[in-house]
């Protein structure tokens, strides 16, 4: 997967199209990511010892990886990602638009 935890992504399809958020969790087995503030669902929680009152809780639900694009930290545009190798042999991700390295 080309998106990692902590990356800034933009939603390109679905009800939250155009919104940006930080990746909180990547689920590679299901090709899904959980993005902060995106795909909010309401869970009706029964009272438990942890939450004695119960109620409606808002959580982020996973969104398919094909519905998000990485936002390049250098050019601040949504972009596709390519891979390249540095002089020391380390594989890094790079922006296809500005050709800069995305990884820290």
UniProtKB/Swiss-Prot annotation:
The keyword Zinc does not apply. GO terms for molecular function: rRNA binding; structural constituent of ribosome. The keyword Phosphoprotein does not apply. GO terms for biological process: translation. It comes from the Bacteria. CDD domains: KOW_RPL26. SMART domains: KOW. InterPro entries: KOW (IPR005824), Rib_uL2_dom2 (IPR014722), Ribosomal_uL24 (IPR003256), Ribosomal_uL24_CS (IPR005825), Ribosomal_uL24_KOW (IPR041988), Translation_prot_SH3-like_sf (IPR008991). Keywords: Ribonucleoprotein, Ribosomal protein, RNA-binding, rRNA-binding. Pfam families: KOW (PF00467), ribosomal_L24 (PF17136). Signal peptide: none annotated. One of its GO terms (cellular component) is ribonucleoprotein complex. Belongs to the universal ribosomal protein uL24 family. NCBIfam families: rplX_bact. Part of the 50S ribosomal subunit. One of two assembly initiator proteins, it binds directly to the 5'-end of the 23S rRNA, where it nucleates assembly of the 50S subunit. This is Large ribosomal subunit protein uL24. It comes from Halothermothrix orenii (strain H 168 / OCM 544 / DSM 9562). The gene is rplX.
């Amino acid at each position: 997967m080309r998106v990692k935890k902590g990356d800034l992504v933009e939603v390109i399809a679905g009800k939250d199209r155009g919104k940006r958020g930080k990746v909180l969790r990547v689920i590679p087995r299901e090709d899904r990511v959980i993005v902060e503030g995106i795909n909010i669902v309401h869970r009706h929680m029964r009272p438990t010892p942890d939450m004695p009152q119960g109620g409606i809780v808002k959580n982020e639900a996973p969104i398919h990886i094909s519905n998000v694009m990485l936002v390049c930290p250098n050019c601040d545009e949504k972009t596709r990602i390519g891979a390249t190798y540095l002089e020391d042999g380390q594989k890094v991700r790079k922006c296809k638009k500005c050709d800069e390295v995305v990884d820290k």
